[in-house]
């Protein structure tokens, strides 16, 4: 039985992870977890899964829960996340928190010898060189939970990675894939949160609409699979049936197909290289799709993706700036402070004023992250 540490238990990925664990109680046990502000859902999870250690964000929530669950050890804040991530009895850390707050717990878990299932893409975006180096030194498996990177991992099983010609990441195009740039100026938060194919959290859905999410995934793929940015291509695949593919030097392609359901990559990260049965409401039949559609990305229509490629190629602290600026800009949009159209402009502004620092250490990354957030907040 694998003992799971789950960060971000009440979020979209966390909820679907718990569904897998619920279906397979003989294979998995939740021994520690974290959640943010959703106390009602958090209480229900604690009652059902009976973790031994829990981290919440606010001190007041920790105090409240300590009175309700005297047999559980509680922590709060970032230090609480770090405590839970290194819980001695845990085998696997599944990091599903949103944002760069996931970086330090991941590094701590690697240092503690935990296997890592990574859904927090910001960890690799901001500090990929540090994370991959630490994982290599500790001989730690770093398995992707993102559907695209899980697809690449599956396509590369048994393959010689030196024979990769290109990695192709697929994208749905998000909520506004058929709108022009001019039409984006007046879109609302409600409209932006309607993703055509996937059920995701608010931040991720907005990132999908701008395609910053795909840009972060490009950087994540660069670190996970050691492929140059020029050899990572993004294509629009409207149906979200082909989750990504690899092109090899002989001209052949290997792709992973399946229903757009995050339980598939989550279970694969937890059971790799094995697979589990997943009960679906509707069986996936390839014959239900008379055609699958592919389109080139229009980088003028999706400038966020171009910004992400530029940040990745510049390297150093520039990806940290892009990520931090985007997190603040998206929060501003969700709070009604920023027009959707201006999310990319705020990120570009932050990148233009920053001179990248090469091969940054952890303290430098954290400092640049905080400085960027503070700067972008002044622009809201």
Swiss-Prot record:
Catalytic activity: 2-C-methyl-D-erythritol 4-phosphate + NADP(+) = 1-deoxy-D-xylulose 5-phosphate + NADPH + H(+)
Residues engaged in binding NADPH: 10-13, 36-38, 120, 122, 201
Residues that coordinate or bind Mn(2+): 146, 148, 217
Source organism of this protein record: Listeria monocytogenes serovar 1/2a (strain ATCC BAA-679 / EGD-e)
Binding residues for 1-deoxy-D-xylulose 5-phosphate: 121, 147-148, 172, 195, 208, 213-214, 217
InterPro entries registered for this protein in UniProt: DXP_reductoisomerase (IPR003821), DXP_reductoisomerase_C (IPR013644), DXP_reductoisomerase_N (IPR013512), DXPR_C (IPR026877), DXPR_C_sf (IPR036169), NAD(P)-bd_dom_sf (IPR036291)
Keyword Manganese: yes
Segment forming the signal sequence: none
SUPFAM superfamilies, alphabetized: 1-deoxy-D-xylulose-5-phosphate reductoisomerase, C-terminal domain, Glyceraldehyde-3-phosphate dehydrogenase-like, C-terminal domain, NAD(P)-binding Rossmann-fold domains
Lineage: Bacteria, Bacillati, Bacillota, Bacilli, Bacillales
Name this protein carries in UniProt: 1-deoxy-D-xylulose 5-phosphate reductoisomerase
Family: Belongs to the DXR family.
Obligatory cofactor(s): Mg(2+); Mn(2+)
Source superkingdom: Bacteria
Keyword DNA-binding tagged: no
Biological processes per GO annotation: isopentenyl diphosphate biosynthetic process, methylerythritol 4-phosphate pathway involved in terpenoid biosynthetic process
Pathway note: Isoprenoid biosynthesis; isopentenyl diphosphate biosynthesis via DXP pathway; isopentenyl diphosphate from 1-deoxy-D-xylulose 5-phosphate: step 1/6
GO MF entry, a single one: 1-deoxy-D-xylulose-5-phosphate reductoisomerase activity
Function recorded in the entry: Catalyzes the NADPH-dependent rearrangement and reduction of 1-deoxy-D-xylulose-5-phosphate (DXP) to 2-C-methyl-D-erythritol 4-phosphate (MEP).
Cited Pfam families: DXP_redisom_C, DXP_reductoisom, DXPR_C
Keywords: Isoprene biosynthesis, Manganese, Metal-binding, NADP, Oxidoreductase
Known EC number: 1.1.1.267
């Amino acid at each position: 039985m694998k003992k799971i540490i789950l960060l971000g238990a009440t979020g979209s990925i966390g909820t679907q992870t718990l569904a897998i664990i619920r279906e397979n109680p003989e294979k998995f046990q939740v021994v520690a977890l974290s959640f943010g502000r959703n106390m009602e859902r958090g209480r229900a999870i604690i009652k059902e899964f009976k973790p031994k250690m829990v981290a919440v964000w606010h001190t007041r929530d920790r105090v409240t829960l300590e009175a309700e669950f005297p047999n559980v050890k509680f922590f709060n804040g970032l230090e609480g996340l770090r405590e839970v991530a290194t819980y001695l009895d845990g085998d696997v850390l599944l990091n599903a928190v949103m944002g760069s707050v996931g970086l330090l717990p991941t590094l701590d878990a690697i240092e503690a010898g935990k296997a890592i299932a990574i859904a927090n893409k910001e960890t690799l975006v901001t500090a990929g060189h540090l994370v991959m180096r630490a994982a290599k030194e500790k001989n730690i498996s770093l398995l992707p939970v993102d559907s695209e990177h899980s697809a690449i991992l599956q396509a590369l099983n048994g393959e010689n990675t030196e024979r990769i010609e290109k990695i192709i990441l697929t994208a749905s195009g998000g909520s506004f894939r058929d709108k022009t740039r001019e039409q984006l100026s007046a879109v609302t938060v409600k409209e932006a949160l309607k993703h055509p194919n996937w059920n995701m959290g608010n931040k991720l859905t907005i990132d999908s609409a701008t395609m910053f999410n795909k840009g972060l995934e490009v950087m994540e793929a660069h670190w996970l699979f050691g492929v140059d940015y020029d050899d990572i291509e993004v294509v629009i695949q409207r149906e979200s049936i082909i989750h990504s593919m690899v092109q090899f030097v002989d001209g052949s392609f290997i792709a992973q197909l399946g229903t757009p359901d995050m339980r598939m990559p989550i279970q694969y990260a937890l059971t790799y290289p094995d697979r589990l049965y997943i009960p679906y409401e509707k069986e996936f039949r390839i014959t239900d799709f008379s055609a699958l559609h592919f389109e080139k990305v229009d980088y003028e229509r999706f400038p966020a993706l171009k910004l992400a490629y530029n940040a990745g190629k510049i390297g150093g602290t520039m990806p940290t700036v892009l990520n931090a600026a985007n997190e603040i800009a998206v929060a501003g949009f969700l709070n009604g402070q920023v027009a959707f159209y201006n999310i990319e402009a705020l990120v570009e502004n932050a990148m233009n004023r920053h001179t990248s620092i090469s091969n940054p250490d952890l303290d430098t990354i954290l400092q640049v992250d905080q400085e960027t957030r503070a700067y972008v907040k002044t622009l809201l």
